[in-house]
Swiss-Prot record:
Its EC number is 6.1.1.22. One of its GO terms (biological process) is asparaginyl-tRNA aminoacylation. It is an enzyme of class 6 (ligase). Belongs to the class-II aminoacyl-tRNA synthetase family. It comes from the Bacteria. Homodimer. InterPro entries: Aa-tRNA-synt_II (IPR004364), aa-tRNA-synth_II (IPR006195), aa-tRNA-synth_II/BPL/LPL (IPR045864), Asn-tRNA-ligase (IPR004522), Asp/Asn-tRNA-synth_IIb (IPR002312), NA-bd_OB-fold (IPR012340), NA-bd_OB_tRNA (IPR004365). PROSITE patterns: AA_TRNA_LIGASE_II. It catalyses: tRNA(Asn) + L-asparagine + ATP = L-asparaginyl-tRNA(Asn) + AMP + diphosphate + H(+). It comes from Halalkalibacterium halodurans (strain ATCC BAA-125 / DSM 18197 / FERM 7344 / JCM 9153 / C-125) (Bacillus halodurans). This is Asparagine--tRNA ligase. Pfam families: tRNA-synt_2, tRNA_anti-codon. Keywords: Aminoacyl-tRNA synthetase, ATP-binding, Cytoplasm, Ligase, Nucleotide-binding, Protein biosynthesis.
């Protein structure tokens, strides 16, 4: 019976065949232990000399790392194994014998591993992180489908930047200037006025010259937009969504979390509602904690976000930022025009902001004024202004950075490990 490691528990005490790669091996006298992987998981294959004979045993000992095989054996329950099972090998066929695999069991430097990222993703821990990434994506689609959202795909090539930033990748679009998208938000607002509730999932590009463990040049965003949803309701949707994906990872990625040594008790407590602290109170809190490098009107740095997050036992919303710190499209607080109806969701354990969101401006004249204040072309944003001319409604949205979220949930030490092929400052290979 041909099967996969993920399904091997269905065949206890039965003979099965796996298509697999040899991740590692060791031998002890008359027993050889083969660490096998097939993409769905890892399992130990046990080759007993007395059962397979001298010839097969010697073949097993001579197998090279990352050789591809068809392995046949009997499935046994084993509580000590991460998957709960092991395979007593009866025979195997070599599909392709690998030679001089560069990533050996010894320690390697980060640059070496990044140069061999196309191979590094095969390793147990990298595989676990990317499996968790996959589960977050799956749970994202499930959550938004169950809550009545329509998936919409905004363009990646745009003629303008949604936040009026200079951190853009420029290209020529025939005879016009074009830019790689930093956000699909403006297009998603248009889609929300057609479908009510929408979300997108796609790559975004920021030419930031940052070398922190939180930054990538190319990263993936989940961006929902919702018509007839005001600020507080948007926060509720955000916290329910984040709690949903965390619980989905706990349910479906227990082996991966164990492989990574993740403290799951931290994740088990992630349930809505999340605490909220206003920007004003956050500044006061930081001053009380001895931070003298920040004043009202300044944006938070990583140390500030970490200090605020450490005060709470779950993700925390920082709300009502100064208008001067935020993009042009955010709705002002009706009680204070110097702050806007926005929130950043800060993840625990030093992972920083994972969501930025706000209620969007719905008034035509105010939006036009904000565009002018930010020196943005009214012609370029004419279509966006149109949304406020024909049946404008209160609406809100947010963007979740997938890689930072994967990093937090998996406990990965650097955001470069949370995407298969990271694009970093000075790294475009492989």
């Amino acid at each position: 019976m041909k099967t996969t490691i993920a399904k091997i528990g269905q065949y206890v005490d039965q003979e099965v065949t796996l298509g697999a790669w040899l991740a590692n091996k060791r031998s002890s006298g008359k027993i050889a232990f083969l660490q096998l992987r097939d993409g769905t998981g890892f399992i130990q294959g046990v080759v007993v000399k007395a059962e397979v004979g001298d010839e097969w045993f010697q073949k097993a000992k001579n197998l090279t790392q990352e050789s591809s095989l068809y392995v046949t054996g009997i499935v046994r329950k084993d509580e000590r194994a991460p998957s709960g099972y092991e395979l007593t090998v009866t025979s195997f066929d070599i599909i392709h014998e690998a030679t001089d695999y560069p990533i050996t069991p010894k320690e390697h430097g980060t640059e070496f591993l990044m140069d061999h990222r196309h191979l590094w993703i095969r390793s147990r821990k990298q595989h676990a992180v990317l499996r968790i990434r996959n589960e977050i994506i799956r749970a994202t689609y499930e959550f938004f489908h169950e809550n009545g959202f329509v998936k919409v795909d905004p363009p990646i090539l745009t003629g303008s930047a949604p936040e009026g930033t200079t951190e853009l990748f420029h290209t020529k679009y025939f005879d016009e200037d074009a830019f790689l998208s930093q956000s699909g938000q403006l297009y998603m607002e248009a889609a929300a006025l057609a479908f009510g509730r929408v979300f997108s999932f796609g790559p975004t590009f920021r030419a930031e010259k940052s070398k922190t463990r939180r930054h990538l040049i190319e990263f993936w965003m989940i961006e929902p937009e919702m018509a007839f949803v005001e600020f507080e309701e948007s926060l509720e949707i955000q916290e329910n969504y984040v709690a949903y994906i965390v619980q989905s990872v706990l349910k479906h990625c227990a082996i991966e979390l164990k492989t990574l040594g993740r403290d799951t008790s931290v994740l088990e407590s992630i349930q809505a509602p999340f605490p909220r602290i206003s920007y004003d109170d956050a500044i006061k809190f930081l001053h009380e904690k001895g931070f003298d490098d920040i004043e009202w009107g300044d944006d938070f740095g990583a140390p500030h976000e970490t200090a605020i997050a450490e005060h709470f036992d779950k993700p925390v919303f920082i709300t009502h930022y100064p208008t001067s710190l935020k993009p042009f499209y955010m709705e002002p607080d009706p009680n204070r025009d110097d702050v806007v109806l926005c929130a950043d969701l800060i993840a625990p354990e030093g992972y920083g902001e994972i969501i930025g969101g706000s209620q969007r401006i719905s008034d035509y004249d105010l939006l036009k004024k904000r565009l002018e204040e930010h020196d943005l072309s009214l012609d370029a944003y004419a279509w966006y202004l149109d949304l406020r001319k024909y049946g404008s409604v209160p609406h809100s949205g947010f963007g979740l950075g997938l890689e930072r979220t994967v990093g937090w949930i998996s406990g990965a030490g650097h955001v470069r490990e949370t995407i298969p092929f990271p694009r970093l400052l000075n790294r475009l290979y492989p």
